[in-house]
Amino acid sequence: MDNVAGIDVSKGKSMVSLLRPFGEVVAKPFSVGHTGSELKELANYLKSLDGETWVVLEHTGRYYEPVARFLHEEGIFVSAVNPKLIKDYGNNTLRKVKTDKADARKIAHYGLVLARGM
């Protein structure tokens, strides 16, 4: 996997963090609304990146479903991961930063680790 997009999905919008192997930042975290046009713009952006891009998001409630479905239908590899796995990943620090950007970055890092094991 050349790029991993970690997506923190909430009602109506998502925060996206894009990383390459070894944690290289592709772009600063950015927000995407759940409208067709914004999701299409996200899909086009992900497809324009060099190499293959894998999207990782938490399997939370029903909010993730339209995002995952849309990106999958656009031909992007999407994985929905149990939120407990994401929560437990990297919990070896005393500093607890809880923002949408930090969550998206954590999901992307988790995806990088998963990709190495594939």
Residue ranges and their predicted role:
Residues 1-118:
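Phosphate- and other anionic-substrate recognition elements at nucleic-acid/protein interfaces
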